[in-house]
Structure formats: structure tokens, C-alpha cells
């Protein structure tokens, strides 16, 4: 039996979910997450036995808050012991939600496997890696931290695997099939900076460009008035496969999930990494793609409309090459590779 844990954010949860659903066809699997994370909101997507713990991150808390978090962590150990009575091996995907299972696995001397999504490992994964049987990685840069790390890639959601004809999907969005479609988005929550950038770009975009802007739910009301002839504005999309299929190039953040999905669909990007990401990991994620020739990277303070437009034009000028290069990052069959590593 395999115990899987990963959550808190979509970046940790969705790969864990994809792996869990894959393993269900092979052997018994149980999922452990947090009641505070996105995994609890989306618990109906987890088609196996699941346990949600009342745990919270330790970072940036005062003494009493940390004491409370530690008490919750100890209580979680009892719940995990009750939930995992049979023999198991564990795969954790990082984030505070997976630390309780990681510690439990070490204390019970079970086999622990770690998957690191980002170029720079999370604090949880750094702590637990010393006791792990194997560390599985997504970015080659991560080998600086885990020299023995095995690159398996990042699992992708089943609904994103199907690619659709680009011109046909553009028409479904009411866009011109032969114009360059620029996808502007900041991940599942949206990004205020990228929404403002989209607003500033609207008046200077060349006529051969059109835009799909995903604002994020909390920003939609502020930016919905950008909707127009060459601008499609949505809070978010439940079918990102359609969005990616319609897109030629993107302006995006550089989370591991975003990069993985763009690479699957061959959509190169002007990456504007989130400047406050822990250890600046989004910047290093994006630089790996830039080195592959699959995108260009601009720091947020550099990302003025003229510079972004210049970067877009550079990519579009060599669109086929950039598209093929970003595809090189995607590791087909990541779930299967991960499972094989757990068996081996």
C-alpha cells in the first residue's frame, strides 16, 4: 500500500492527485492532506480513502502560534497511526501538509520517497530528504541540492492530456483562427501585476495579436471591462486544456505546474516570476526553460509593457523553434516513472 501526501497549494496537490489516481489502477493507495489546503476544497476529486489533518504551517508565526501548530502536529501523528495500520511506503509532494506523514514514516521506519516539484526544494523536502530512500525531481537544477535525485518530471492532470486543433479552439472562443493568441495568466489565483500588465498592453498590441486573460476570481470585477474584440477576459477556466490549445504564446508566472502544462502543450512564455516566492524558486524554474530555448525571463521590476512586447515579438518571430524547445522539458508518463521508482 502507498500513502500519498501533498497539498496546501495546487502546486503540491495536483501532482499528488494525478499520481494517486494513476496508482489506484495498480495497488491500494491512501491520501493524507490538510483541512486548510486546496486539497480539502477539492476532496471529491480524490477517489480513495483520505484523511485530512488539522495542521498548519510553522513559518512566520509567533511563539504561541508555533506552540499551537506543534500541538496539532503531534495530534496528527495519532490520527495517521490510526489511519495507516497496515504496512505502507510513502510518497510526499512537499508543503506543510505532507510533513506529518513524512515524519510518521521516518519514525515507523517505513520507506519514504519524496517528489520535489520546484527547482529549489521546499523546507519540508530538505528536512526529510536525509531519511528518504529516493528523491524524485522535476528540474535538473534541483540536483544541486539532491545530487542523487532522479528526474521523473511532474504528473499532469488527466483532463489536460488531450490536445485540440488550435484554429478550431480559437473559433470557439470567438477569436480569429490565424491571429497570434497570447495567454496572460498568473496561475489558479491570478496575479494582479499581470492583469495590470495586460491592461497596459491592450492599447499597444500589434493587430496580429489577440489575448486570453485569466484574471483569477478575486480580480475579475476590476478587469472584466478589458473584454473586447481582441481580448477575452475570464476569471478562470475549468478546462485549461482548451485554453492552452488555443494559445500560441503566454505571459505567465513560473510555478512548476504552470511550466509543466505550458511545456506539454508547446506554448512558450515570457515568464515574469513571482518575486516573493520562497527562495525565489520561480525565477530558477523559469531560467531552466530559458536555457532550453523555450521562453524568456523578465524580473517583475523589468516587465514594463515595452520590454514585454519586445520579448513577445522575439518569441513569435521564432515561434516554431520556441514551441519545440519548451516541449523538451515535459516528461511523458511521469506517474508511471514515479511508480517504477517506488517499486525499484
UniProtKB/Swiss-Prot annotation:
Similarity-based family: Belongs to the glycosyltransferase 28 family. MurG subfamily.
CDD domains with a match to the protein in the record: GT28_MurG
Keywords: Cell cycle, Cell division, Cell inner membrane, Cell membrane, Cell shape, Cell wall biogenesis/degradation, Glycosyltransferase, Membrane, Peptidoglycan synthesis, Transferase
Matching InterPro entries: GlcNAc_MurG, Glyco_trans_28_C, GlycoTrans_28_N
Gene3D superfamilies, alphabetized: Glycogen Phosphorylase B (3.40.50.2000)
Membrane topology type: Peripheral membrane protein
Residues reported to bind UDP-N-acetyl-alpha-D-glucosamine: 9-11, 118, 157, 188, 282
Pathway involvement of the protein, from the record: Cell wall biogenesis; peptidoglycan biosynthesis
Protein name as catalogued: UDP-N-acetylglucosamine--N-acetylmuramyl-(pentapeptide) pyrophosphoryl-undecaprenol N-acetylglucosamine transferase
An annotated Gene Ontology molecular function: UDP-N-acetyl-D-glucosamine:N-acetylmuramoyl-L-alanyl-D-glutamyl-meso-2,6-diaminopimelyl-D-alanyl-D-alanine-diphosphoundecaprenol 4-beta-N-acetylglucosaminlytransferase activity
GO biological process, one term: regulation of cell shape
Lineage of the species this protein comes from: Bacteria, Pseudomonadati, Aquificota, Aquificia, Aquificales
NCBIfam families to which the protein is assigned, alphabetical: murG
Localization per record: Cell inner membrane
Species of the source: Aquifex aeolicus (strain VF5)
Catalytic activity: di-trans,octa-cis-undecaprenyl diphospho-N-acetyl-alpha-D-muramoyl-L-alanyl-D-glutamyl-meso-2,6-diaminopimeloyl-D-alanyl-D-alanine + UDP-N-acetyl-alpha-D-glucosamine = di-trans,octa-cis-undecaprenyl diphospho-[N-acetyl-alpha-D-glucosaminyl-(1->4)]-N-acetyl-alpha-D-muramoyl-L-alanyl-D-glutamyl-meso-2,6-diaminopimeloyl-D-alanyl-D-alanine + UDP + H(+)
EC number assigned by the record: 2.4.1.227
Gene Ontology CC: one annotated term: plasma membrane
Pfam families, per the entry: Glyco_tran_28_C, Glyco_transf_28
Ion transport keyword on record: no
Catalytic class of the enzyme: transferase
Gene: murG
Function: Cell wall formation. Catalyzes the transfer of a GlcNAc subunit on undecaprenyl-pyrophosphoryl-MurNAc-pentapeptide (lipid intermediate I) to form undecaprenyl-pyrophosphoryl-MurNAc-(pentapeptide)GlcNAc (lipid intermediate II).
Amino acid at each position: 500500500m502507498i500513502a500519498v501526501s501533498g497539498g496546501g497549494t495546487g502546486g503540491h496537490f495536483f501532482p499528488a492527485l494525478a499520481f494517486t489516481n494513476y496508482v489506484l489502477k495498480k495497488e491500494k493507495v491512501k491520501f493524507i492532506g490538510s483541512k486548510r489546503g486546496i486539497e480539502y476544497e477539492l476532496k471529491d476529486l480524490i477517489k480513495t480513502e483520505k484523511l485530512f489533518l488539522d495542521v498548519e504551517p510553522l513559518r512566520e508565526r509567533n511563539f504561541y502560534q508555533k506552540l499551537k501548530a506543534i500541538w496539532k502536529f503531534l495530534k496528527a501523528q495519532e490520527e495517521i497511526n490510526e489511519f495507516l495500520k497496515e504496512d505502507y511506503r510513502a510518497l510526499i509532494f512537499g508543503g506543510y501538509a505532507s510533513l506529518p506523514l513524512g515524519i510518521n514514516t521516518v519514525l515507523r521506519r517505513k520507506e519514504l520517497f519524496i517528489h520535489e516539484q520546484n527547482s529549489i526544494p521546499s523546507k519540508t523536502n530538505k528536512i526529510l530528504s536525509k531519511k528518504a530512500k529516493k528523491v524524485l525531481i522535476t528540474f535538473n537544477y534541483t540536483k544541486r541540492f539532491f545530487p542523487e535525485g532522479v528526474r521523473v518530471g511532474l504528473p499532469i492532470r488527466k483532463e489536460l492530456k488531450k490536445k485540440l486543433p488550435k484554429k478550431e479552439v480559437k473559433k470557439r472562443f470567438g477569436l480569429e483562427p490565424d491571429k497570434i493568441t497570447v495567454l496572460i495568466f498568473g496561475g489558479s489565483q491570478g496575479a494582479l501585476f499581470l492583469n495590470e500588465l495586460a491592461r497596459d498592453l491592450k492599447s499597444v498590441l500589434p493587430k496580429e495579436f489577440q489575448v486570453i486573460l485569466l484574471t483569477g476570481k478575486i480580480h475579475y470585477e476590476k478587469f472584466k471591462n478589458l473584454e473586447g474584440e481582441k481580448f477575452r477576459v475570464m476569471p478562470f477556466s475549468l478546462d485549461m486544456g482548451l485554453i492552452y490549445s488555443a494559445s500560441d504564446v503566454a505571459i505567465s508566472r513560473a510555478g512548476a505546474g504552470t511550466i509543466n502544462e505550458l511545456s506539454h502543450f508547446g506554448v512558450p512564455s515570457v515568464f515574469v516570476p513571482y518575486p516573493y516566492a520562497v527562495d525565489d524558486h520561480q525565477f530558477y524554474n523559469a531560467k531552466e526553460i530559458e536555457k532550453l530555448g523555450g521562453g524568456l525571463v523578465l524580473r517583475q521590476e523589468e516587465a514594463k509593457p515595452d520590454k514585454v512586447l519586445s520579448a513577445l515579438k522575439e518569441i513569435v518571430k521564432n515561434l516554431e523553434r520556441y514551441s519545440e524547445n519548451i516541449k523538451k522539458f515535459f516528461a511523458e508518463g511521469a506517474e508511471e516513472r514515479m511508480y517504477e521508482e517506488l517499486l525499484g
